[in-house]
């Protein structure tokens, strides 16, 4: 939301580094890389609702610190802490959906849930641009504080626990108290102590990421495309102000095609994903998670993603009318959402018993590249490659990853049967 004000911040804090300019935006995503490692195990021990409420409070407090920042270091630190607290719904949101939704409705539910964290960076800069011009960049964060302060009590009273092991343990504890029988145990209770459970859970996302080839390669695909997305996000301000003369108030409109593209990708992905599951159920076929990786959808999405990068890069370099690179961005964003939603739905069902840990593993790699790849974006575009070959290079890298969903569509079930993590399903 404050991306349109980057140039204003650089002037106020006497900064000239292009790396600092992009890092001010992307460091928030770096918080998403580390937060899930703590949030995922805690959610599997204490449930989802307490973490949502604590995360909301901490996020609002850290946003106050961001608004009061007096130098670049302070601003970067509080932006990172905002990302840590903001990672709570990103990490356990899909787990809550898995807790509540039937299998045939999860695709649409996942799509609806994804709209928040993905449309935020698209719609936010539009409102932020006009707010920054009218009141300065700090009011972006004061507005977030006001909204957060209003939502905290609403969430506290309205959110209910959904995680089955925690709910069953609470019921068991109540029955122990009512019956006086200390030997009653939850069917889902673990024999491990809280410390042992936490230790096992905190290592699980990294074990999944390192030792599960399905999660490793799928996460890598999503992470690279997500990193490219944030390379575009963090450079839009410089591209559209420098090449097309957009002002502080109108620069946010450059992010609008990303939102439109994501809406298209999410809508199509959710519809097709649930439709194929319902069709298979109607035919009496056994559901397998691999059907979420529809080859006739994920492969075209992968190719369109590359095409969008080529269109954006070369039309910016040749100074074609600004609407044309925006069309390229729209195509790219529609395609990336198709891929991300298919992959996330697949991984969630393939490792359902460890949904929070799988989401954490996916978030760690995705957020690391989302935060770090943009640091070299301006240098890439200012090199001999410029926008044309620079974005073409990114497109060719993405092209190499296109077959990954198809590989696991064919061989995923065999690999899952060999997985020790999958036995809990």
Language model feature labels by segment:
Residues 1-425:
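A six-helix transmembrane bundle that forms the core substrate pathway of small-molecule transporters
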């Amino acid at each position: 939301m404050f991306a349109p004000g980057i140039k204003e911040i650089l002037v106020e804090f006497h900064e000239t580094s292009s790396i600092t300019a992009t890092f001010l935006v992307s460091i928030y995503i770096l918080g998403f890389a580390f937060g899930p490692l703590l949030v995922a195990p805690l959610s599997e021990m204490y449930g989802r609702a307490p973490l949502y409420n604590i995360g909301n409070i901490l996020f609002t407090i850290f946003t106050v610190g961001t608004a009061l920042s007096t130098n670049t270091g302070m601003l970067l630190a509080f932006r990172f802490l905002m990302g840590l607290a903001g990672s709570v719904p990103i990490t356990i949101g899909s787990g809550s959906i898995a807790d509540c939704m039937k299998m045939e409705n999860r695709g649409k539910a996942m799509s609806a849930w994804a709209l928040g964290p993905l449309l935020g960076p698209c719609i936010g800069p539009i409102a932020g641009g006009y707010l920054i011009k009218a009141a300065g960049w700090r009011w972006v964060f004061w507005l977030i504080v006001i909204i957060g302060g209003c939502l905290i009590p609403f969430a506290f009273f309205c959110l209910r626990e959904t995680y089955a092991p925690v709910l069953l343990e609470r019921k068991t504890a109540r029955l122990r108290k009512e019956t006086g029988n200390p030997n009653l145990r939850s069917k889902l209770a673990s024999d491990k102590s809280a410390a042992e459970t936490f230790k096992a859970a905190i290592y699980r996302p990294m074990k999944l990421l390192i030792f599960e080839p399905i999660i490793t390669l799928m996460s890598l695909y999503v992470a690279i495309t997500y990193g490219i997305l944030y390379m575009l996000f963090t450079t839009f301000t410089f591209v559209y102000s420098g090449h097309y003369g957009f002002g502080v108030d109108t620069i946010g409109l450059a992010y609008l095609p990303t939102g439109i593209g994501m809406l298209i990708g999410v809508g199509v992905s959710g519809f097709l994903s649930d439709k194929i599951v319902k069709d298979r159920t109607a035919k009496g076929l056994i559901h397998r998670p691999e059907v979420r990786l529809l080859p006739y959808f994920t492969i075209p999405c992968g190719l369109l993603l590359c095409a969008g990068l080529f269109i954006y890069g070369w039309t910016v370099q040749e100074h074609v009318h600004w609407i044309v690179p925006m069309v390229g961005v729209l195509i790219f964003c529609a395609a990336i959402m198709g891929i991300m939603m298919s992959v996330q739905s697949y991984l969630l069902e393939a490792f359902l018993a460890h949904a929070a840990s799988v989401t954490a593993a996916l978030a760690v790699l995705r957020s690391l590249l989302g935060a770090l790849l943009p640091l070299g974006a301006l240098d890439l575009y200012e090199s001999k490659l410029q926008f044309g070959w620079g974005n073409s290079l990114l497109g060719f890298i993405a092209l190499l990853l296109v077959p990954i969903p198809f590989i696991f569509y064919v061989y995923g079930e065999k690999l899952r049967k060999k997985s020790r993590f999958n036995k809990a399903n």
